[in-house]
């Protein structure tokens, strides 16, 4: 359904940014949800959606006309596709451009999140959400994720160019890191190196809950910390 969103357009006095809002209502009985994001350079933030909403977004975009939104529902599964409209050679640090995308998700369903973005900043606190899988494909970016412990297994896959990546994982969850990349500076405090490119926390095999992190990056600073 391409029309299931509210639209509000305005301009910011300093950045000439278009302001738009979008929303998708949660279908009754939905247990799992899939979110596909496509976007260029922007700062991506995450908040909880209002009751009754599966997904919502608040965007403030300079130099970009907005996003397209599509929603599908089948049985107990609901899918949202949210993609930035085409842009021409605009970078995040272009002078005078302000682009921020605040995503809002319902905490009830089990989520599969897939993001393909250009250069950008991404900061997500995922602790309130049941995230079974999150896949990030980015160019030059700063990625900051805080993962939770609401599922027995969660998977994180990151493919990036030049990136600063920081991931926080709970102390009570076993965690495995697989890393493939040319030039990576890494900080995996609390992990044991099993072999080249493979790291695990102590007691991983017997942990009741597990997080699997798989990264493939060009040149990155990569930190995984326990909390």
Language model: regions and residue ranges:
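Extended beta-solenoid/beta-helix repeat architectures
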Residues: 106-110, 116-119, 126-140, 148-153, ...
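Conserved "repeat-terminator" motif of extracellular CCP/Sushi domains
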Residues: 83, 104-107
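Gly/Pro-rich, low-complexity intrinsically disordered segments
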Residues: 1-23
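Short acidic/polar, Gly/Pro-enriched loop/turn segments located at secondary-structure boundaries
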Residues: 33-39, 43-51, 70-73
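Short, surface-exposed interaction patches in beta-rich subdomains
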Residues: 18-28, 50, 56-61, 65-73, ...
